[in-house]
A protein has these predicted regions:
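Outer-envelope exported proteins of Gram-negative bacteria
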Residues: 47, 219-221, 225, 299, ...
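Alpha-amylase-like alpha-glycosidases and glucanotransferases acting on alpha-linked glucans and related
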Residues: 1-5, 12, 18, 55-203, ...
Length: 506
């Protein structure tokens, strides 16, 4: 696909301002959509919205299909009569409004959501009866039947076993013995239904938000990781999809080879796909996954796109990524199958880092736009990430969720020589401001789409960085201050979008 010339904002749902500890899909999200409209933006890019687990990373979700219950808006539940304000308004959701406290959310949020579930069940319909919920409730379960039952069963068993990794469950449940699963379903029916209720509410609220954004001319760009987490419903219930043994343990895992930045490489630990199996099914699971994603997003960014061409396979049990080897992925065979099943694919390929020629060939053959990141550009050479080298069919960023904020990058990461190069390249002035000058450079580039992290428009310091790769704790916490999303800022953003023909004032 090719974008018309436009601009957008990278803003995670979790980072939206508002009460109750984390951004949500209610008024905070709609207010942000309104802000984007006033600011002349066209696209709202978010991070993956799946349930988070260890280290709170949205890229290590326990499901490739489920939504994060933390994003369910409590005020909307109250408006539906499922909660009262006193159920949640006076709870301490964390001591710092500028950061998400995931520990506090885990301790307190599900207690409130269970109240909503029990109130919902008191109104629980019998199929065929005319109630406010009957049609939607049963329709959602029917339409989600290819993933919802296994996910809810997985979460209920996980909770019953102290939330440990499924590889540590009792063997009968771990290997999915039919009698053991049937017995667990019978004994824990209410708990299984609770997890289904959370997904129902997430789906209702998300689709309402998505429709609202569309009505305001805002397209939502979602994000999916190429791999699923080892501790996930997908790995537990669909072990034939992965390189696993009879016990469901991975034979090989994902990562990256050693390079200049990491002498031991990166050991991610995700189970690798059994691409021969996927090919034998016509890529049915991938078709299901992308059909679901494209039903909730307008555009889809796929993380680690290079893994579809060649991927680094590390023997399970290794403590570093050194002893891995390159293996060939499905390449265009997968994307042809997806196109045949789903039609035009509005995909953005995350193609950052060292790339083989075969990866570039795959990107060119697919026609998907790749990414360019300003913070990678200033090496003293004529980098492909310098704005004057951007092709039209790409997405330009000053930085991504894995980068420092522009303010932090310029002030703390660059050498004096690099700062001088940046200043001269963009002709930076004190009057305009360092960060504003760099944003101008990205917006003025020939890239069809320019995406600016909201933190950079707000000129947030390094402390507001969303993620530092390789650091296990302290990530994914930043939240915006609603007071900074001013009419003056929206006007400034709109003016820049109009100036560089990324928006037209009518």
């Amino acid at each position: 696909m090719e974008f018309k010339r436009c601009s957008g904002i990278l803003m995670p749902i979790s980072s939206l301002p508002g009460g109750y500890g984390i951004g949500s899909m209610g008024k905070p999200a709609r207010d942000f959509v309104d802000f984007l409209t006033r600011a002349g933006q066209t696209i709202w890019q978010i991070l993956p919205v799946g349930p988070t687990g260890y280290a709170d990373s949205p890229y290590q979700s326990c499901s490739a299909f489920a939504g994060n219950p933390y994003f369910i808006d409590l005020d909307l539940l109250a408006a539906d009569g499922l909660l009262t304000k006193k159920d949640y308004a006076n709870i301490n959701w964390g001591g710092d409004a500028a950061k998400v406290d995931y520990g506090t959310l885990y301790e307190k949020r599900f207690t409130v959501l269970r109240k909503a579930y029990h109130n919902f069940m008191r109104q629980r319909p019998v199929p065929g009866y005319d109630t406010p919920y009957s049609d939607d409730w049963y329709r959602f379960q029917f339409l989600s039947s290819d993933w919802l039952p296994d996910y809810c069963l997985y979460m209920a068993i996980k909770e019953d076993n102290g939330m440990v990794d499924w590889q540590q469950w009792p063997r009968a449940l771990r290997v999915r013995e039919p009698e053991a699963l049937a017995r667990f379903r019978a004994e824990h029916a209410e708990e299984i239904e609770f997890w289904a209720f959370l997904q129902y509410e997430f789906d209702r609220q998300w689709r309402s938000l998505h429709a609202y954004a569309k009505s305001k001319g805002i397209a939502i760009m979602g994000d999916i990781p190429i791999y699923v987490a080892a501790d996930s419903a997908d790995a537990w219930a669909g072990r034939e999809l992965f390189e696993t043994d009879a016990e469901g343990k991975p034979r090989r895992v994902a990562g990256c080879p050693p390079d200049y930045f990491a002498a031991d490489g990166q050991l991610w630990g995700n189970p690798l796909y059994d691409w021969n199996y996927h090919r034998s099914t016509g890529y049915a699971w991938w078709i299901c996954r992308l059909r679901h994603a494209l039903s909730i997003y307008d555009i889809l960014r796929i993380d680690h796109f290079r893994g579809f061409d060649t991927y680094w396979a590390i023997p399970a049990g290794e403590t570093t990524a050194r002893n891995g080897r390159w293996e060939q992925g499905p390449r265009m065979d997968l994307f042809r199958a997806l196109h045949n099943a789903l039609g035009s694919l509005p995909i953005v390929a995350e193609d950052l880092g060292e790339m083989f020629d075969s990866v570039r060939q795959l990107l060119a053959e697919s026609g998907f736009p790749g990414m360019k990141v300003l913070q990678f550009a200033f090496t003293g050479e004529d980098s492909v990430d310098l704005p004057h080298n951007y092709p039209r069919n790409c997405v330009a960023y000053p930085g991504t969720h894995d980068n420092n904020t522009l303010s932090g990058w310029f002030g703390e990461e660059l050498t004096p020589a690099q700062r001088k190069q940046v200043e001269e390249y963009f002709v930076l002035t004190k009057q305009e401001g360092i960060v504003r000058g760099m944003l101008r450079g990205v917006q003025a580039s020939t890239a069809a789409l320019a995406i600016i992290p909201m933190a950079d428009w707000l000129e947030e310091p390094a402390a507001s960085r969303m993620n530092t790769p390789g650091m296990a704790q302290g990530n994914w916490q930043w939240r915006a201050d609603a007071k900074k999303l001013t009419p003056a800022l929206a006007k400034e953003m709109r003016t820049m979008a109009v100036r560089y023909f990324r928006h037209t004032d009518k």
